[in-house]
């Protein structure tokens, strides 16, 4: 009899816990209902500890704003950068002339001049320096809540507690920003690109 009561209590407890847990897809759907319109977010996906946002906004391609050349960007940031110029091959593309800006802490940004856009385009990067601020105000060292508040209006905080990586991907899936959290702080921002240069 005691075993039967114990089994019934265990099953009832599992049912309550299961009902309290919200599936990843349900979380993603709820988060979609709270997106900020200026980011033109078209989809949100959650897989284990990673949330991926797909957006049509050009802020993913131009996270530091739209610049006609590197010198204007360097002057505007008022930060001390070391600058390397060279050629790099990305994926199966031809080699491209790349400007690499570096900070003393190891942060770097690879950029190139887009001949079709006439603007500086992002290729690669890792930002850990808290002084490097994206156009939308994001920077390393911010709280997780502040980062999510940039992309979403009010939402259940419990939905992002277990998120350790936030990926913001351009609609064409060519450029992305990867925000990696350690605890409740933004540890670093990564920039990835799958551009084809032709």
Locations of regions flagged by a protein language model:
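Short, exposed beta-strand-loop hairpins at the edges of beta-sheets
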Residues: 168-171, 175-187
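Positively charged n-region of N-terminal signal peptides that target proteins for export
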Residues: 1-4, 20
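Sec-dependent N-terminal signal peptides
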Residues: 4-13
